[in-house]
């Protein structure tokens, strides 16, 4: 071991092995470090054991949360005078220093930092902070979990703070969550407490019954047919030669051409389920029925759309002609008056000329007539 190096608690193992390190100041370290709670490091400093702290490892570590206490061993909390509790956080003189009881209540110390208040009549609570108000007098009037509030007894009346889904003065009314009709597609709404559920009809699903179930998901169509989904139903677009709901039927092969003696008409073939291979012989296993079909050919003439167009055009033309005739008669209407001026004042008739014919005015009411022109010899003025 190199001279001048002192090994403590096997910390200086490097010295024993003869490693080229700077010798530690063993004498100085041992004189300052509390070797019962730590050890000397190679650099001469103290390394404390768990639960101890300080420059020389001379101070124990208190229990976490300890407020007014100390320790003799690690993780202890020994309370100072006047404090109590596990963490030394309760004042033993709370009744004299803080006076926690309110509204005239008397504080009684129970030891260990605890106390209780002796409340005067009409008050209650840990610190006599609550008054026997409307809530207490009514005996918890709020229903369905509602909270009664009366400003700690000082309010004249109580109010109920209702839980979600209830309403009313005392929370007695269950809110109808189906009032807005949230369920779609004819579903039945079932009201609950602050919730609802939809009883969906067949073919729909989802919280609001808005999802149409895919009836083609099970691939019901046969023969490679394409499936088209519907509401609680499906359609199969069968390939040529097949029919039925799921294309399970094989359509018959057309029979031989009709003979000359056969009556004209279509041939109706009964569909046969495709339970086996189709016979190769023509018409084998098929029943053909000839049906006479009488076709009455429509006489040549106007179709319904053309006939409607002609009627409408004729009605409009007649209306225009009638309006023109009425306006013409009104404009050229003549009146016969007794001798003298016309029997009707302007602007309807102008003064009579010679044979007392009245002049018709087409001007609006209130407009002056044009000045009278002298009639030509042998002519009568009329408009």
UniProtKB/Swiss-Prot annotation:
Entry keyword set: Calcium, Disulfide bond, EGF-like domain, Glycoprotein, Membrane, Repeat, Signal, Transmembrane, Transmembrane helix
Name of the protein in question: Protein delta homolog 2
Glycosylation sites: 157
Extracellular side stretches: 27-306
Keyword Disulfide bond: yes
Any one GO cellular component localisation term in the record: membrane
Paired cysteines (S-S): 29-40, 33-46, 48-57, 66-71, 79-88, 95-107, 101-117, 119-128, 135-148, 142-160, 162-171, 178-189, 183-198, 200-209, 216-227, 221-236, 238-247
One Pfam family in the UniProt entry: hEGF
GO molecular function, one term: calcium ion binding
Signal peptide: 1-26
Cellular compartment(s): Membrane
Sequence ranges assigned to domain EGF-like in this UniProt record: 27-58, 62-89, 91-129, 131-172, 174-210, 212-248
InterPro entries membership: EGF-like_Ca-bd_dom (IPR001881), EGF-like_CS (IPR013032), EGF-like_dom (IPR000742), EGF-type_Asp/Asn_hydroxyl_site (IPR000152), EGF_Ca-bd_CS (IPR018097), Notch_signaling (IPR050906)
TM annotation in the entry: 307-327
Function: Regulates adipogenesis.
Topology in the lipid bilayer: Single-pass type I membrane protein
Ranges per topology, Cytoplasmic: 328-383
Bias (Pro residues): 367-377
Positions of the UniProt region annotated as Disordered: 364-383
PANTHER family attached to this UniProt entry: EGF-LIKE DOMAIN-CONTAINING PROTEIN C02B10.3 (PTHR24044:SF501), NOTCH LIGAND FAMILY MEMBER (PTHR24044)
Top-rank taxon, per record: Eukaryota
Organism taxonomic ancestry: Eukaryota, Metazoa, Chordata, Craniata, Vertebrata
């Amino acid at each position: 071991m190199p001279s001048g190096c002192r090994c403590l608690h096997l910390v200086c193992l490097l010295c024993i092995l003869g490693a080229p390190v700077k010798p530690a100041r063993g004498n100085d370290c041992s004189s300052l470090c509390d070797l019962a709670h730590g050890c000397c490091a190679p650099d001469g400093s103290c390394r404390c054991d768990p639960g101890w702290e300080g420059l020389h490892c001379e101070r124990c570590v208190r229990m976490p949360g300890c407020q007014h206490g100390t320790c003799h061993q690690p993780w202890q909390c020994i309370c100072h005078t006047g404090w109590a509790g596990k963490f030394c956080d309760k004042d033993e003189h709370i009744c004299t220093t803080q006076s926690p009881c309110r509204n005239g209540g008397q504080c009684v110390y129970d030891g260990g930092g605890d106390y209780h208040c002796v409340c005067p009549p009409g008050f209650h609570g840990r610190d006599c902070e609550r008054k026997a108000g409307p809530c207490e007098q009514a005996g918890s009037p709020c229903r369905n979990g509602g909270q009664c509030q009366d400003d700690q007894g000082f309010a004249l009346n109580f109010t109920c703070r209702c839980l979600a889904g209830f309403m009313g003065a005392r929370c007695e009314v269950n809110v109808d969550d189906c009032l807005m009709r949230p369920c779609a597609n004819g579903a039945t709404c079932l009201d609950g407490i602050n919730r609802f559920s939809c009883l969906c009809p067949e073919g729909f699903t989802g919280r609001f019954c808005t999802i149409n179930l895919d009836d083609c998901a099970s691939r019901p169509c046969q023969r490679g047919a394409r499936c088209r989904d519907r509401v609680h139903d499906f359609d199969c677009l069968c390939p040529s030669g097949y029919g039925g709901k799921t294309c399970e039927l094989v359509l018959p092969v057309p029979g031989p051409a009709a003979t000359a003696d056969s009556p004209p008409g279509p041939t109706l073939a009964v569909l046969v389920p495709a339970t086996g291979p189709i016979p190769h012989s023509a018409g084998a296993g098929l029943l053909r029925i000839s049906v006479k079909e009488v076709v009455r050919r429509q006489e040549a003439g106007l179709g319904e759309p053309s006939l409607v167009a002609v009627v409408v055009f004729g009605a409009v033309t007649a209306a225009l002609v009638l309006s023109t005739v009425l306006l013409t008669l009104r404009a050229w209407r003549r009146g016969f008056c007794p001798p003298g001026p016309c029997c009707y004042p302007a602007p309807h008739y102008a003064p009579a000329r010679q044979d007392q014919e009245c002049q018709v005015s087409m001007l609006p009411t209130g407009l002056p007539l044009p000045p009278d022109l002298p009639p030509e010899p042998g002519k009568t003025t009329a408009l």
